[in-house]
Every structure is written in structure tokens, then in C-alpha cells.
UniProtKB/Swiss-Prot annotation:
One of its GO terms (biological process) is triglyceride catabolic process. Induction: By oleic acid. Transcriptionally up-regulated by YRM1 along with genes involved in multidrug resistance. Expression is also dependent on RSF1 and RSF2 for transcriptional induction during growth on glycerol-based medium. InterPro entries: AB_hydrolase_1, AB_hydrolase_fold, Carboxylesterase_BioH. The gene is LPX1. Its main location: other. SUPFAM superfamilies: alpha/beta-Hydrolases. It is found in: Peroxisome matrix. The lineage of its organism: Eukaryota, Fungi, Dikarya, Ascomycota, Saccharomycotina. One of its GO terms (cellular component) is peroxisomal matrix. Keywords: Hydrolase, Peroxisome. This is Peroxisomal membrane protein LPX1. Its EC number is 3.1.1.-.
């Protein structure tokens, strides 16, 4: 993002509490979050007719806030007509991902609950977007995979924060394990198909003998093999860190995210997915579902469920895209995001919002008018005047 147009700050805050059982090694452990805030340097000089926009990006499992950096300048420059302007952008690392994982090392437990992750997002977003000097704005949440799940969960938990949800193949319903299983195992117990677990282990290595082995693996053996070259380089540069206890250049390298925490993102899903599945029906916001045409990451029931259950659902299929379409074909996804934001802004009641400075007496008059209007809509005539 252009440095003269936006100021970048990296911040740290405490994660939401209390959390799901076993989310930390000890009950007294407290987790932290690291996130980036991009604030417009031009926000005070904006035209009153331009809609102000805040964007919150949520990454998928095994990723981090860095996967979205490629998007930022291309989203900022999208509206040449001046219908809207971006005020703030938030990029968040979940507690066991990226820079947050580094801060929480030694405290993370075996239960990474995506609902807790949504609560973390809400804590940051309400703080950053709801400050007393904030102007009326449209808040848009954009989430991929796990982040799409969490975007939906955010609207369930706090339905008045986000105005538009853009979901890039959110993972809500997953494939069930087919096999002997364990007799009597409750359906909401942690479980993962063994073949999926083994495949994930090969794609989520976290320790390497040296820099060369690290780069070779990230380019040829990780989930990001087919990622856009710039995004892949951003990931390589961001995830690299020295192995514990090694301060020498040329020594062992590790990723910021531990492999075990990466695997836990998938192993725990059956324990918290039922909550969202039961509550998606209450999401009323316009919800854009972007999905790659050739993705087979989720079973067909995932898309069918969202299409049937969400009240304001819009499907947008990216030709040739996979589940990782956000990192493999980012320009196509950016084009669709810009289109949906532009379309939403033009029909938004906040497009020309401006709150004048009013005295207490003027506010009282304003309320009386609002109450009379509300009463006229709510009042139902009855045959008896009194109860």
C-alpha cells in the first residue's frame, strides 16, 4: 500500500477470554494477538459524499496476515469515481498463526476453536473501528476458508458490526471420516480422517536444516506451490524465523507457525462447527460466496447448505480456481471483491451519511420525531382502548 496514503502500525493486544477448554496449556495462561492497521492519511480531507469503508481480512488455516498484502494497493485504487474511500484496513494473525504464534509460543494448548478466533476478531475490530473519532462507515469483512467461517461467526456473535460479508470458500461443513472409527464416539468429538492427517503433515513442515531447504520446501512441497509469485515470496519472507536456540546465520530455520498447531486447525473442527451450523440462519447481511470452479476441498454439502440457509446469499464462481484461489489467482479475486464492494456501496443507506453537530435540545426534537415515526409503524389498532 502506498506509504504516503496509508500509515501502517503493527499492534499487539490480549486475546479474548475466557476461551475454550484446553486452548492453553495452563488455565492461567493468557494469549495475545498481533495485527496490522493501515489508516488513511487523507481521512480528514474526504468529501462528505464519499462513503467511508473499513476492511477486515481473515486468513485461512496455515496462513497469516501477510497473504493479503498483495491485495491492499489494488483495492485502494479501485474506485476512480469517488463513490467510496478506504479509511482503515485490518490484517489479523490468529493466536496460533504468524506473529501471534510467536508471542504465544509455550502457552498454546490442543484446542484451537475457530469461534474463539471470531471473538478475537470482534475484539480488535470493535476497538479499531468503533473509536470515538470514527466516522460513519461501511465495515466489510473478507475471509478465506477458516477466515470465512470466522466471518460468519462474527456476524452471528455481533450482527451489527459488519455490513457486508465476502467469503472465499468458507469451510463450514467438512468431509466425515469413513472407516472403523471409535465406537460410541460423540459426533462433536475431535476427529480427522487418517489419510487427510497424513497429507496435511506433508504440507505443513515447520523445521528445516537451513535456508536453502526451507525455500525449496516452500516453493515445491508446501500448500503454496502454485501461489502467485509475489504472494509466495511474501510468505517465505514472513514465515522464516531462526530455530530455537540457534543464533548463527546459515543455521536451522523454522516457520513461525508450529506444525502441531497447523494440524489442530483441522482436528478440532467437529467440536465447534455445530454452533455455526445452527446459527447461520440468523445471518441477514448480504453475503458473497466466492469459490473456485474446480475446488474440491469442501464437500458439495458445504455450498448447498450456505446457499439454502443464508438469507441474502450471492454465489460468485471463479473459473479454474481452486480452494486456494485467493493466493493462486489473486487478481481475479480482487476484481470480484472490488465489484461487490462497489455494487454494495451504491445501494447502501450510509452512502451520504453525515451527522451534524446538534445541541441537546435539537437532539430531543430529533428523537421525538423518530419516536413518532416508529410508533406509527409499530402501533396495532385494537377494539379495546385499555387492557
Amino acid at each position: 500500500m502506498e506509504q504516503n496514503r496509508f500509515k501502517k502500525e503493527t499492534k499487539t493486544c490480549s486475546a479474548s477470554w475466557p476461551r475454550a477448554p484446553q486452548s492453553t496449556l495452563c488455565a492461567t495462561d493468557r494469549l495475545e494477538l498481533t495485527y496490522d492497521v493501515y489508516t488513511s492519511a487523507e481521512r480528514q480531507r474526504r468529501s462528505r459524499t464519499a462513503t467511508r469503508l473499513n476492511l477486515v481480512f481473515l486468513h485461512g488455516s496455515g496462513m497469516s496476515k501477510v497473504v493479503w498484502e498483495y491485495y491492499l494497493p489494488r483495492l485502494v485504487a479501485a474506485d476512480a469515481e469517488g463513490n467510496y474511500a478506504i479509511d482503515k484496513v485490518l490484517l489479523i494473525d490468529q493466536v496460533n498463526h504468524g506473529d501471534s504464534a510467536v508471542r504465544n509460543r509455550g502457552r498454546l494448548g490442543t484446542n484451537f476453536n475457530w469461534i474463539d478466533g471470531a471473538r478475537d476478531v470482534l475484539k480488535i475490530a470493535t476497538c479499531e473501528l468503533g473509536s470515538i473519532d470514527s466516522h460513519p462507515a461501511l465495515n466489510v469483512v473478507i475471509g478465506h476458508s477458516m477466515g470465512g467461517f470466522q466471518a460468519l461467526a462474527c456476524d452471528v456473535l455481533q450482527p451489527n458490526l459488519f455490513h457486508l460479508l465476502i467469503l472465499i470458500e468458507p469451510v463450514v461443513i467438512t468431509r466425515k471420516a469413513i472407516g472403523a472409527g471409535r465406537p460410541g464416539l460423540p459426533p462433536d468429538s475431535p476427529q480427522i480422517p487418517e489419510n487427510l492427517y497424513n497429507s496435511l503433515r506433508l504440507k505443513t513442515c515447520d523445521h528445516f536444516a537451513n535456508e536453502s531447504e526451507y525455500v525449496k520446501y516452500m516453493r515445491n512441497g508446501s500448500f503454496f506451490t502454485n501461489a502467485h509469485s509475489q504472494i509466495l515470496q511474501n510468505i517465505i519472507d514472513f514465515e522464516r524465523t531462526k530455530a530455537s536456540g540457534d543464533d548463527e546465520d546459515g543455521g536451522p530455520v523454522r516457520t513461525k507457525m508450529e506444525q502441531a498447531q497447523n494440524l489442530l486447525c483441522y482436528m478440532n473442527m467437529q467440536t465447534f462447527a455445530p454452533f455455526l451450523i445452527s446459527n447461520v440462519k440468523f445471518v441477514r447481511k448480504r453475503t458473497i460466496h466466492i469459490v473456485g470452479a474446480r475446488s474440491n476441498w469442501c464437500p458439495p454439502q458445504n455450498q448447498l447448505f450456505l446457499q439454502k440457509t443464508l438469507q441474502n446469499y450471492h454465489l460468485d464462481v471463479i473459473p479454474g480456481g481452486s480452494h486456494l484461489v485467493n493466493v493462486e489467482a489473486p487478481d481475479l479475486v480482487i476484481e470480484r471483491i472490488n465489484h461487490h464492494i462497489h455494487e454494495f456501496v451504491l445501494t447502501s443507506p450510509l452512502q451520504s451519511s453525515h451527522i451534524p453537530q446538534l445541541t441537546l435540545e435539537e437532539r430531543a426534537v430529533m428523537f421525538d420525531r423518530a419516536f413518532d415515526s416508529f410508533k406509527n409503524e409499530a402501533l396495532v389498532k385494537t377494539t379495546k382502548q385499555k387492557l
